[in-house]
Curated annotation (Swiss-Prot):
It is found in: Cytoplasm. Belongs to the KdsB family. Its EC number is 2.7.7.38. GO terms for molecular function: 3-deoxy-manno-octulosonate cytidylyltransferase activity. It is an enzyme of class 2 (transferase). GO terms for cellular component: cytosol. It catalyses: 3-deoxy-alpha-D-manno-oct-2-ulosonate + CTP = CMP-3-deoxy-beta-D-manno-octulosonate + diphosphate. Activates KDO (a required 8-carbon sugar) for incorporation into bacterial lipopolysaccharide in Gram-negative bacteria. This is 3-deoxy-manno-octulosonate cytidylyltransferase. It comes from Acaryochloris marina (strain MBIC 11017). It comes from the Bacteria.
Amino acid sequence: MNILAVIPARYQSQRFPGKPLVMLDERPMVQWVYEAAKSCDFFQDAVVATDSDKIADCVKGFGGKVVMTRDDHLTGTDRVAEVAGFYDDMDVVVNVQGDQPFVTPEALEQLVRPYREGERPEMTTLGCPLDMDEDYASPNAVKVLCDRNGHALYFSRSPIPYFRTQGTVPVYHHLGLYAFRHDFLMQYSQLEPTPFETCEGLEQLRVLEYGYAIKVCQTQKAAIEINTPEDLVKAQLFIQQGMTS
């Protein structure tokens, strides 16, 4: 089983321009993510995908591998698919988001475990229990509802489901890590963007809208994502506290 990790890194982020290069404890964020991926012995290779010369120079500077991509990709997964096209010998391709400097090898192993155990899902992702008090109403926390077989029914930034009556149903906090069967990723990249994908701003909805399945693997805790300057402050505090909070 050959598995490739691709880290899409875009310089022109709308909410936080240049965020892959922000410094965390004397290392740029993209280096944190790259080193986390490289620490996983189940990845045959790891590479950063970018259209930015600044990011490419940074990656080369710390000894990482980088592939330059087109600058017209609509999503990170489209960028990952371009790179995957150069790696026909890979069975599975993992999209390790460049805004997750604290992603753990354990979380990445859970993401690819179905493939390593002989399953062949088109795509997997991760979910953890949602903090209903803190995150249920937040558009920055993506919610995912699953069917009885652990496949995603829908992802949304809105508070779903609506609780008309009192009761408890499992609502998961979606974590933006994805693994794809190589052949399916190539197929995904040829699909036109879809209405729900566009209105929610969630690329994984393209898969569901075309009738494909996403297996949601369970993990216990969400890692800090850096999408805004405010998130960077939280990340720096997390490091100061010994990365244990």
